[in-house]
């Protein structure tokens, strides 16, 4: 029997980032890419990320979280989704902290208030091989990449950061001047990024505030992307455009991002919103290959 059939699904969002959570701990099975796509195509269940809770693999962790994008591809990190998972595990109020595992590593989550959570998103990986890039780049704070005519590029020299997944951040003066819906998919699939990349446009409002718009790998334009917000802060701080803490404003809302100097950890804090919960209709998976 399909372990997803009639399984409880919790629909939430993190500042507009649409999240669906399914708890498969104890089920002895996971989710496939085709199954994730089938859920994403179901009316009322469309998501940016599907967070699948599986049995923990390490002592002290509450769950291993496998993350799917709407196209069925997997992602190693989703900050907004991780905050939503933390809410589901901490909502009874018995404790204020929970430790999760993902493909990117362990993530410590903490309740700040009823609907606000912090997540330690890990340490940024900044070497070309860690992003990864298809060629060496001695300075990943500004790599050789452009979009547009060679003699007059529209965008050029992004910073690249891996925050569990690859990010390229272009700093611009006016985000609205660029058609990210057209630019994003081209740059996402640029040969420089063998695993594709999330593409962001960032504007420095002040040393304490960044405006951000994101084309998310495997999703498209999104109202919010937590790992992109973390990557933007790291990129801005490396260029001396901000300090190590700033508010990142996305179309869906704001996140507080802190790149802690003591241990190089990036901490993201922001709100979550519960929408509804439902049971997954077995008919959803009738045509989904294993």
Swiss-Prot record:
GO biological process per UniProt: lysine biosynthetic process via diaminopimelate
Primary localization: cytoplasm
GO molecular function, one term: diaminopimelate epimerase activity
EC number(s) recorded for this UniProt protein: 5.1.1.7
Biological pathway: Amino-acid biosynthesis; L-lysine biosynthesis via DAP pathway; DL-2,6-diaminopimelate from LL-2,6-diaminopimelate: step 1/1
Residues holding substrate: 17, 49, 69, 79-80, 165, 198, 216-217, 226-227
InterPro entries in the cross-refs: DAP_epimerase_AS (IPR018510), DAP_epimerase_DapF (IPR001653)
Pfam families, sorted: DAP_epimerase
Sites annotated Could be important to modulate the pK values of the two catalytic cysteine residues: 167, 216
Active site: 78 (proton donor), 225 (proton acceptor)
GO cellular component: cytosol
Catalytic activity: (2S,6S)-2,6-diaminopimelate = meso-2,6-diaminopimelate
Intracellular or extracellular location(s): Cytoplasm
Top-level lineage group: Bacteria
Keywords linked to the UniProt accession: Amino-acid biosynthesis, Cytoplasm, Isomerase, Lysine biosynthesis
Family that this chain belongs to: Belongs to the diaminopimelate epimerase family.
Subunit structure: Homodimer.
Function of the molecule: Catalyzes the stereoinversion of LL-2,6-diaminopimelate (L,L-DAP) to meso-diaminopimelate (meso-DAP), a precursor of L-lysine and an essential component of the bacterial peptidoglycan.
NCBIfam families named among the record's database cross-references: DapF
HAMAP family for this protein: DAP_epimerase
Name of protein: Diaminopimelate epimerase
Naturally occurring in which organism (per UniProt): Methylocella silvestris (strain DSM 15510 / CIP 108128 / LMG 27833 / NCIMB 13906 / BL2)
Gene symbol of the encoding locus: dapF
